[in-house]
Amino acid sequence: MVMELHNHTPFSIYFITSILFIFFVFFKLVQRSDSKTSSTCKLPPGPRTLPLIGNIHQIVGSLPVHYYLKNLADKYGPLMHLKLGEVSNIIVTSPEMAQEIMKTHDLNFSDRPDFVLSRIVSYNGSGIVFSQHGDYWRQLRKICTVELLTAKRVQSFRSIREEEVAELVKKIAATASEEGGSIFNLTQSIYSMTFGIAARAAFGKKSRYQQVFISNMHKQLMLLGGFSVADLYPSSRVFQMMGATGKLEKVHRVTDRVLQDIIDEHKNRNRSSEEREAVEDLVDVLLKFQKESEFRLTDDNIKAVIQDIFIGGGETSSSVVEWGMSELIRNPRVMEEAQAEVRRVYDSKGYVDETELHQLIYLKSIIKETMRLHPPVPLLVPRVSRERCQINGYEIPSKTRIIINAWAIGRNPKYWGETESFKPERFLNSSIDFRGTDFEFIPFGAGRRICPGITFAIPNIELPLAQLLYHFDWKLPNKMKNEELDMTESNGITLRRQNDLCLIPITRLP
């Protein structure tokens, strides 16, 4: 150590001293700022902060972020203040506090933070998910609920869903027919199937651009996962140019070109009125608002909405199907009951379609229980306060980010007995639903910013699960026991398995 110190030049010693002095001054300013804030504003409780990083060190590790946030909330309460970098965040982990945010004060918390990475992929916040609350958002949401994602429109995609799921069943059957019982990667095939449904619903027939688009959407989601340094230090120009920004822009340029080609193809296609009515896809619907409406969408607006639909209808649906099958493998009693129900309903037909899905009451309970334990988006898309307000006796300053931990709320022991156990029966004689009125169960959010694509997502979950249970029995490879199945979660925007779900399918003989 002495040798190293002597080897420093006067310039380097001066430089180090200057850095230490700047750090000391900054530390004092942070202390003064924090003490001033705490003396004038009664924030919710939270752990002590460190200079520069705040509480970042307490949510970084080998586990997904929602675990750390729940553990901290167990100590500091369901309305908790965290300083992440230079940004104040309020973490919500109880149904009561979620109701305050998404119902009582819903309008005040209806804006989105201006995240650097989401700004890139959402075309400056022009999609339904990341746009700010206002006239544009209201018009866009109206298009989604009245035109784009109505029950009638979603039902018109029934043949697409049935064809894509039939292709999946065919692939599995081919594997099951191989000698010795071959292993099938269910994760990859489910992901491909749900995105295939979303692609055909959005673009019409199978597009030559489809695989490139799906691949790039997956890359975008990976780069969007977690906290961006630029969003933790929004005042720093240096951080704005660092991190995943360059990588994301590169991937997004490819996605943008593909979407523009698809839009141009739709514009140039001449259709008769009869053909348009028969096969109208989501791009067709959105393009009508470039011609026949006072509220005109640009090409970039359309691209942003299509991406939102892909994430809601493809990524989240595949996550629920994947976790549903994982839980069924780990709980053979539930698997047997679910298979018995599906086979009882469909055996007279000999095949599964959507006409009788409403009769699968136990399967619907399985889906709800899956979303309780594994919500597709564990930390709901953050909100930001528009004005200063008071919640539960605490002050929430304006421009404060709000993070709602839906994963933790689904494990709240006050509302759920045996929180870690997979028990679909808890929903059988219960009116609790996922449409935003029961705040102990909010996998799709609630209030003004609830996911508008629920009607699009649910059939993409019910039909595949029913088919997988009807046609096949399932077992783990390498003589693994059911309880040995790894259930580790990956870190990211959506809740996925860390390791792919690989099973041995056994074709069921009628």
UniProtKB/Swiss-Prot annotation:
Annotated keywords: Heme, Iron, Metal-binding, Monooxygenase, Oxidoreductase
Cofactor(s) the protein requires to work: heme
EC number: 1.14.-.-
Positions with a binding annotation for heme: 451
Record's keyword annotation contains Protein biosynthesis: no
Keyword Cell membrane attached: no
Domain of life of the source: Eukaryota
Pfam families named among the record's database cross-references: p450
Disulfide bridge positions per record: none
GO molecular function: heme binding; iron ion binding; monooxygenase activity; oxidoreductase activity, acting on paired donors, with incorporation or reduction of molecular oxygen
Alphabetical list of PROSITE patterns matching this protein: CYTOCHROME_P450
Alphabetical list of CDD domains matching this protein: CYP71-like (cd11072)
InterPro entries per the UniProt record, alphabetical: Cyt_P450, Cyt_P450_CS, Cyt_P450_E_grp-I, Cyt_P450_sf
Family: Belongs to the cytochrome P450 family.
Matches recorded under PANTHER family: CYTOCHROME P450 71D11-LIKE, CYTOCHROME P450 FAMILY 71 PROTEIN
Record's protein name: Cytochrome P450 71D10
Lineage summary: Eukaryota, Viridiplantae, Streptophyta, Embryophyta, Tracheophyta
